[in-house]
């Protein structure tokens, strides 16, 4: 059962990012629980991005891989970042030059249609942490609080926006996946996180330790 959470829910002085139901690749997900839970369609590859974009600073989020309906394997979960708003042709996170996706099946990361050896595999029940450092252009990825490595990112889009979004999705047309995002409000879906990690910024509650110098993706976090 979930633990108790102090008052970190959205409030007039601090709103936490959710996933954006109006901005999806391939129009292929069902959103619920205030857009903190997404379920992708089994017939389409797709990803979905956060409601808030990041152009400077250091931000952390966690997402739980809740379930998948693949007949075999680990479910083809994908998680990472995208440099611009989703476009329908960009169906897979990492297919383009301006998005990066961590793949559950083999632990690789996908960028510019290339897979690179990276970390461990993951599947249902695992919590993946993303730490995006836009001061140093890096993305660190965690599995259940353990670092899987760091990816160097670049602003490569034509007339680059310099803004990035956290992104959740799947890589495959044979299964559907369910993600639950926690951008700092202290819940995965309807369940409060079971044990709060440390967070030096004091902004947001996460299952595992928020890396030093990072903060939640929220209105307060964007103005630190």
Regions found by a protein language model. Give the residues of each.
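PRY/SPRY (B30.2) beta-sandwich protein-interaction domains
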Residues: 1-224
